[in-house]
């Protein structure tokens, strides 16, 4: 691969690289630093994050302390709600308070909810995702507004299609227009492919137009390569040209 831009090194804090060091948690805990507790009350399962003192605590990277999931007679989740550490409804990412799920033979309708469990429009411009399943894998998503009409999301597309390899790993993402055809999104490309190593970890991505030709993204590169540290986090990104 040709290097389009200089290598961009993501600065990591010294504490992140020293797992044995004391960490200042004034800003809060991430989910990976917390224990998980679960209670079941009839059809509702409540999963909470718990700090080292045994106190239910909000995980700052996912935006809630407890998620309550209601299941139907087939053990499928039909609704979930997010709560803060005090047990009050909380907006995940400041955007929505819960999700509802409706199922048919080939697809699932996922609707975003407000604090009163009513459908709400996300900041991305849609209220519901209709997701087609192929086997157990999510294949196509299309977006709908509060009136059930197809809507273009803020990224400039009406839907997306996921491609998989024989191992079931997601290898591509194609942005779709209203009719399900590939379309160039505001990111500058229509198709993004993922490169994975022998362990299945994503180590790079490349961008293509609707015809499958390499294309420059809106940020100027044709793709990226990643190097990861021992913890699995990306600590170096190399930007690529068309070759």
Predicted regions and their residues:
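Hydrophobic membrane-insertion alpha-helices, especially the h-region
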Residues: 2-15
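Buried hydrophobic residues that stabilize the cores of well-folded domains
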Residues: 22-243
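Hydrophobic single-pass membrane-insertion segments
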Residues: 14-22
């Amino acid at each position: 691969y040709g290097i389009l831009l200089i290598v961009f090194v993501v600065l990591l804090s010294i504490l992140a690289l020293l797992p044995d060091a004391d960490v200042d948690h004034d800003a809060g805990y991430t989910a990976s630093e917390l224990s998980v507790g679960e209670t079941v009350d009839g059809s509702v399962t409540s999963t909470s994050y718990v700090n080292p003192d045994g106190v239910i605590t909000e995980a700052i990277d996912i935006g809630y302390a407890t998620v309550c999931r209601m299941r139907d007679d087939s053990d499928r989740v039909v609704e979930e709600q997010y709560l803060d550490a005090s047990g009050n409804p909380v907006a995940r990412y400041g955007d929505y308070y819960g999700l509802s799920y409706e199922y048919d033979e080939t697809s699932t309708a996922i609707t975003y909810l407000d604090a009163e469990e009513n459908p709400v429009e996300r900041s991305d411009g849609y209220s519901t995702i209709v997701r087609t399943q192929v086997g157990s894998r999510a294949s196509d998503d299309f977006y709908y507004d509060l009136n059930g009409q197809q809507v273009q999301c803020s990224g400039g597309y009406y839907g997306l299609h996921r491609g998989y390899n024989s191992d079931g790993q997601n290898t591509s993402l194609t942005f779709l227009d209203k009719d399900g055809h590939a379309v160039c999104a505001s990111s500058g490309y229509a198709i993004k492919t993922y490169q994975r190593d022998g362990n299945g970890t994503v180590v790079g991505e490349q961008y293509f137009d609707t015809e499958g030709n390499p294309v420059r993204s809106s940020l100027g590169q044709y793709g990226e390569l990643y190097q990861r540290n021992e913890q699995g986090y990306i600590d170096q990104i190399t930007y690529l040209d068309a070759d």
